């Protein structure tokens, strides 16, 4: 069948199936179209992808969201990168707004993998030359990839929206645990508000189990903004919200 040709060095955008409306909106903003991709799953769960036009010499951006089942969508993006490389794209940028396995960025105990590093290695092996992500769980993930990493922050847009919607006079930024203090502090500086911290303990042998110990900072009568980079089961945010209400937070 006939294959469309792509101009050399042309910027092209390809989308995985996890959340195609996101890639479509990006393409519309850039006044371009998505590269047509055929993708489907075999009966045993294997994924197949194929680009339906020439991508030789292009500057490609492969966009994939990573909701559940995350392993499925990660594998699809890896296959898309590999197919793009084998089709002679000049440069391939992986766009992963939520970076898969980002929370597994270090060993908590012996005999554990560093899964975030493995994911960056897989992208490199597949043919990626650059990675773009938003609000990485920890900044050191940028150093895992052997190539440029664009670490984007949603804070400027979100902070302006929060300030315009709720105001800042009665606002307190709250870190739901000690690991998010640095990010919450940046938010507090941006909004010009006080900072509070929820101290918690997490059992390393029981995933998603959270116990709140105490709150550092004044929250009574305040509008509290909880800042976190990832909500999975919602246990951390829910426990923090309950603790804030129990300590007199207004909303």
Give the label of every model feature segment.
Residues 1-251:
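PRPP-associated nucleotide enzymes
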């Amino acid at each position: 069948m006939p294959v469309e040709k792509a101009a050399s060095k042309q910027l092209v955008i390809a989308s995985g199936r996890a959340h195609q409306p996101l890639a479509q909106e990006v393409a519309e903003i850039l006044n371009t179209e998505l590269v047509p991709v055929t993708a489907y799953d075999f009966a045993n769960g294997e994924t197949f992808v194929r680009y339906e036009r020439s991508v030789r010499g292009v500057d490609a951006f492969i966009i994939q969201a990573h909701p559940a089942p995350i392993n499925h969508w990660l594998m699809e993006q890896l296959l898309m990168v590999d197919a793009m490389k084998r089709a002679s794209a000049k440069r391939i940028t992986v766009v992963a707004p939520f970076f898969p396995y980002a929370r597994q960025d270090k060993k908590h105990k012996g005999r554990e993998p560093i899964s975030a590093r493995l994911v960056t290695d897989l992208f490199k092996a597949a043919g990626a030359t650059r990675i773009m992500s938003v609000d990485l769980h920890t900044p050191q993930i940028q150093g895992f990839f052997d190539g440029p990493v664009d670490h984007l922050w949603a804070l400027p847009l979100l902070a302006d929206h929060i300030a315009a919607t709720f105001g800042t006079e009665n606002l307190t930024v709250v870190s739901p645990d000690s690991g998010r203090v640095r990010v919450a502090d940046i938010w507090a500086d941006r909004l010009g508000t006080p900072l509070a911290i929820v101290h918690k303990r997490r059992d390393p042998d029981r995933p998603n189990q959270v116990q709140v110990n105490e709150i550092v900072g004044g929250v009574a009568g305040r509008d509290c903004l909880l800042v976190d980079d990832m909500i999975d089961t919602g246990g951390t945010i829910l426990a923090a919200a309950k603790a804030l209400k129990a300590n007199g937070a207004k909303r």
